[in-house]
Amino acid sequence: MKRPAQLVFVPAPGIGHIVSTVEMAKQLAARDDQLFITVLVMKLPYAQPFTNTDSSISHRINFVNLPEAQPDKQDIVPNPGSFFRMFVENHKSHVRDAVINVLPESDQSESTSKPRLAGFVLDMFSASLIDVANEFKVPSYLFFTSNASALALMSHFQSLRDEGGIDITELTSSTAELAVPSFINPYPAAVLPGSLLDMESTKSTLNHVSKYKQTKGILVNTFMELESHALHYLDSGDKIPPVYPVGPLLNLKSSDEDKASDILRWLDDQPPFSVVFLCFGSMGSFGEAQVKEIACALEHSGHRFLWSLRRPPPQGKRAMPSDYEDLKTVLPEGFLDRTATVGKVIGWAPQAAILGHPATGGFVSHCGWNSTLESLWNGVPIAAWPLYAEQNLNAFQLVVELGLAVEIKMDYRRDSDVVVSAEDIERGIRRVMELDSDVRKRVKEMSEKSKKALVDGGSSYSSLGRFIDKI
């Protein structure tokens, strides 16, 4: 009889990272009753603490909330990736202490009654904690919460810099088109991840990516049928440890049933596939000028809509968007009255439940990877409007590489002065809501493939089994 094993998961503090990490842990615990998992949770200074309310989580999964670390110039960090990496680094001593506290006595004795520490599973932004795993003489694995194409692009650029001596920032003029082996089509520099747009961020990002090679394997929240080209590229050489596509890892339950019920009742009254849903993630918000363009586009499109509209944090402050106290202060005069019979403007949105509702026919999205996987799972086509991080890359992949989305503005950056016109937004809404489009047909086919990937005999089911065998 094999001795039970314990894995320590360290997700980055963003809610999307934590949610997919929890789903990863649930999959592992469900597959092997000899696996025990401890999830170390870091709290962002401007966000609500994570609380586990999912009754379906195994008793073999334990959550430990780490003490808050002293912030280190967090408000002047240039992009979310750099912020997360610095934030995780500041928690290194707390991670070490937490692991010491959860180590079973059997690690100091020869008893086999308690789980042995088998390894760390680190978030894509937590690779600096490989040093801590080494102190405990256990291997590290990486959990890449984004897609295989982003992993491949980062790995490719890191190799160009470190092995070819190429200054990546010289390739990133806005008009350049790059040959990236993980993409079939030429890749426009205008849609590079935000962390590769200037010398300082690029250096920090690629230095971090180079640490991935020190892990024993990389779990990716994707599936073979969606990203076969990028996954085959990653498997084609020895530049990166073995990759295990284990997605889609999704939490399809609403976290606030009371708020969700009113929204879902409204959707119940709408015809099938008639509502376009606009939502831009936990960090997504727009200034007043852009909000008015969106409102104009919705009104002119004539489509029924459900719009999650969030207020931006104060200028220059790193904080989460919040709900408006009075929507009339930001929307065009009379908009709510004129659209009352066809639309609903909300704050927080139970996104998974909305995407799973039969009335939802299209999704105007920032193309965050969790949101993308939720939309594909439910067979809802996307109108791509990325905001930051690797979302521009995701949009390119969906629109150009895979034909699973239409474009609103693929090269949009939320920190730019660009205001997307109502005409461009309306055009995207009309296209994504076409009921007989090729995009909708492809999305429906991918929805079926995403569900098959997770069941016995599916590609991700088999890949997860190989990972369990390894640990």
Curated annotation (Swiss-Prot):
Temperature-dependent activity: Optimum temperature is 30 degrees Celsius.
Keyword Glycosyltransferase (UniProt): yes
Pfam families associated with the record: UDPGT
pH dependence of activity: Optimum pH is 6.75.
Enzyme class: transferase
Residues where UDP-alpha-D-glucose binds: 282, 348-349, 366-374, 388-391
Keywords: Glycosyltransferase, Transferase
InterPro entries, alphabetized: UDP-glycosyltransf_plant, UDP_glucos_trans, UDP_glycos_trans_CS
EC number assigned by the record: 2.4.1.-
One GO molecular-function entry: UDP-glucosyltransferase activity
UniProt name for this protein: UDP-glycosyltransferase 71A15
Species annotation: Malus domestica
